[in-house]
Amino acid sequence: MNTQLDLPKALHDYIKKSNIALALSAIKDDAPLLVVNKSFCEMTGYSEDEVVGHNCRFLQGPDTTESARQPLHDFVHGDGKDSGRFPILNYRKDGTAFHNYVFMSRLKDTGGQPQFILASQFDMTTALQRSKISLNDEKLQDALSDVDQIGREFGLAMMGSAGLLADSIALMAKLTLEDSQR
């Protein structure tokens, strides 16, 4: 275990090495970010040092709607759903807006108690091409499979993620088709 972050070292290392934008937050307090990877930093323009310890609300801005914020808040601070997907308008460090599609899953211990929230982010502003969506889908499937395996080694579990992942992929494809028909 990485005692500084109180999370399995293998999970920490996997997130850092992943090619898709990943962030891991604590369940406790205000869900502070514990670790983010290079892809997350490239997408948002923030360094890891700037974001670790903070809730990801720093990505919200003047045009982020309450109707987009509330489902994220309910997921993070509620205990009903084990996973969810959330479209939200976020802002990079330089102030530019981007349409973020966030997939979140609770990582639970063997006793069923949530320990962490794993979030993957997709910039839908630039990912509205089929090839990019397909590539993101493949990377996300690989990432979820690897994280699930790593998590099991340390008594963590991702509950109900496969069905939600399939729904997310279908929705992303639908959004792409709708956008290309405009």
Regions found by a protein language model. Give the residues of each.
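PAS/PAC sensory module
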Residues: A21, G84-L89, D94-V102, L118
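Output-coupling edge of small sensory domains
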Residues: S25, S105-L107, F122
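PAS-family sensory domains
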Residues: A26-I27, F75-D79, I88-G95, K108-T110
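Conserved hydrophobic beta-strand signature of PAS-family and PAS-like sensory domains
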Residues: A31-L34
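PAS/PAS-like sensory domain cap-loop motif
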Residues: F40-V51
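N-terminal sensory regulatory modules of PAS/LOV and PAS-like folds
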Residues: E48, N55-R57, D63-T64
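PAS/Per-ARNT-Sim sensory domains
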Residues: Q60-H77
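Sensory coupling linkers of modular signal transduction proteins
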Residues: G111-L165
